[in-house]
């Protein structure tokens, strides 16, 4: 009886040691594969000045990508309430082959001010950079929304979070196994209704978050602005009426 129990104990111990060795081997293999993976670097910046900006997104892969020609990159960006993207402008840009972006938010109001709007989502199919073999870039025009006037500070800060980086390749690459976190279903291309499984990629961002300052009005100027607006409205209406009575031709 004791010998049987001892034999079972030895078998259990051997199995445990085998599993631990396998786990350690897998962990070392995973660490080795990850160690050979170069980082995916994402950078986004605003171009132009004023209330109408261009958001430029650049993605650089390391040398572990052997052939990017078989891969497609999709950027899912979440536009904060302080900004908006014009879907009609996007349609015009798509027709001219300037960018490949489409709104995915169903309820969207272009005219809503910042405090009445909601976050919106945009899908941008990035294109390979002709000047960089391992680079993609995407372009998205954005516009400022109207903000409430402030009591003291004449500026407000808008924070643009980092986007989701999705990748789909016709063949497997080591980097996909290294940095893929999950799979996301999305259209294979802008002109296709076919759904592909995209890998949500982990990356390193140059900036933690992109920020931009928006000038806003001051509440202390409310009475002045209202008075001047009313005065100009009355003056222009009077001039229009005088011109109508002076140069207009009336017949009874």
From Swiss-Prot:
Family per similarity comment: Belongs to the PIGX family.
Gene giving rise to this polypeptide: Pigx
| InterPro entries, alphabetized | PIG-X/PBN1, PIGX
Protein name in UniProt = GPI alpha-1,4-mannosyltransferase I, stabilizing subunit
Q: Does the keyword field hold Transmembrane helix? A: yes
List the taxonomic lineage.
Eukaryota, Metazoa, Chordata, Craniata, Vertebrata
Chief location bin:
endoplasmic reticulum
Highest taxon of source: Eukaryota
Its annotated compartments are: Endoplasmic reticulum membrane
């Amino acid at each position: 009886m004791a010998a049987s129990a001892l034999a079972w104990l030895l078998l259990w111990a051997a199995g445990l040691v085998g599993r631990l060795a396998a786990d350690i081997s897998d962990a070392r293999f995973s660490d080795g594969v990850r160690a050979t993976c170069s980082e995916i670097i994402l950078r986004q910046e605003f171009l132009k000045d004023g209330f109408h900006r261009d958001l430029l997104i650049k993605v650089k892969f390391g040398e572990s990508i052997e052939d990017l020609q078989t891969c497609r990159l999709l950027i899912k960006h979440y536009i904060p309430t302080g900004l908006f993207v014009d879907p009609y402008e996007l349609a015009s840009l798509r027709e001219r082959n300037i960018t490949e972006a489409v709104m995915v938010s169903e309820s969207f109001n272009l005219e809503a001010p910042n405090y009445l709007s909601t976050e919106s989502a945009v899908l941008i199919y990035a294109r390979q950079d002709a000047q960089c073999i391992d680079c993609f870039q995407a372009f998205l025009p954005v516009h400022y929304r109207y903000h409430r006037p402030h009591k003291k500070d004449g500026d407000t800060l808008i924070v643009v979070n980092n986007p989701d980086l999705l990748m789909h390749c016709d063949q497997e690459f080591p980097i996909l196994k290294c940095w893929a976190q999950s799979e996301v279903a999305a259209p294979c291309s802008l002109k296709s209704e076919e759904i592909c499984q995209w890998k949500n990629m982990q990356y390193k961002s140059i900036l933690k978050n992109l920020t931009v300052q928006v000038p806003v009005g001051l509440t202390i100027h409310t009475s002045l602005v209202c008075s001047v607006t009313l005065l100009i409205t009355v003056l222009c209406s009077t001039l229009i009426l005088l011109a109508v009575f002076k140069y207009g031709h009336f017949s009874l």
